[in-house]
């Protein structure tokens, strides 16, 4: 595990404090100009942390296709339309944000987006789509996950419900899930990655 670098930790904490302060300023301004109740506020990160600190013991960090490199918190708020305090358990992607905004704002679009709207999950937090697959690619490494499993770049299957640290491969125990995700990964590699 990474040895704690006090200077980097201090810098990271200062950035969090600065971000918190400035998000507060934006919210105060929205309230001041009576725009807050009809403004969608989204907060998330683009990748996991640059060190193994603060990642809930997820495997690896930024620059990895494992959970520690790609799993991030995501907050969305819209006081007039989104019920506060809900927790979505559906695996989502950054690609889902724009289609969701289109649907939330009742706009119609003829564009076929790569992502999907997650508005239905905001309306019903217990809804789950176990067929949904999210692909991650970095430095010729590919992982694919669904709501329960991740198939890492080395083709090891992990049950994230029981093993969020990705320590115990379950390839043999869940061979049908392994085969399904491996097939999906190969198709994605040959149809998407091969274009770039």
Describe every region a protein language model picked out.
Residues 174, 178-185, 189:
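Short amphipathic alpha-helical coiled-coil/interface segments
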Residues 49-67, 82-86, 90-165, 180, ...:
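C-terminal cap/loop subdomain of S1 sulfatases and analogous C-terminal strand-loop tails that border
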Residues 22-29, 100, 104, 188-191:
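Short alpha-helical functional segments enriched in proximate histidine and acidic residues
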Residues 1-8, 78-81, 164-166:
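Short glycine/proline-rich turn/loop motifs
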Residues 4-18, 50, 89, 93, ...:
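Extracytoplasmic/periplasmic, Sec-exported soluble proteins
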Residues 1-39:
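A long, amphipathic alpha-helix that forms part
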Residues 16, 23, 40-45, 73-75, ...:
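Beta-strand elements within well-structured catalytic alpha/beta cores of enzymes
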Residues 4, 28-81, 93:
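Histidine-centered active-site microenvironments of extracellular/periplasmic hydrolases
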């Amino acid at each position: 595990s990474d040895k704690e670098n006090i200077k980097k930790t201090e810098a990271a904490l200062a950035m969090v404090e600065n971000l918190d302060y400035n998000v507060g300023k934006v919210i105060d301004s929205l309230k001041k100009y009576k725009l807050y109740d009809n403004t969608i506020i989204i907060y998330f990160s683009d990748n996991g942390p640059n060190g193994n600190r603060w990642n809930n013991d997820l495997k690896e960090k930024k620059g990895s296709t494992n959970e520690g490199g790609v799993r991030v918190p995501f907050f969305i708020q819209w006081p007039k339309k989104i019920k506060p305090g809900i927790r979505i358990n559906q695996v989502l992607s950054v690609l889902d944000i724009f289609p969701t905004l289109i649907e939330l704002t009742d706009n119609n679009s003829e564009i076929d987006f790569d992502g999907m709207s997650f508005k239905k999950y905001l309306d019903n937090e217990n809804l789950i789509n176990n067929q949904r697959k999210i692909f991650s690619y970095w430095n010729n490494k590919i992982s694919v996950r669904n709501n329960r499993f991740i198939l890492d770049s080395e083709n090891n299957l992990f049950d994230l419900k029981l093993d969020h640290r990705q320590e115990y491969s379950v390839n043999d125990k869940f061979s049908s899930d392994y085969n399904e995700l491996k097939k999906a990964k190969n198709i994605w590699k040959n149809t998407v990655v091969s274009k770039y």
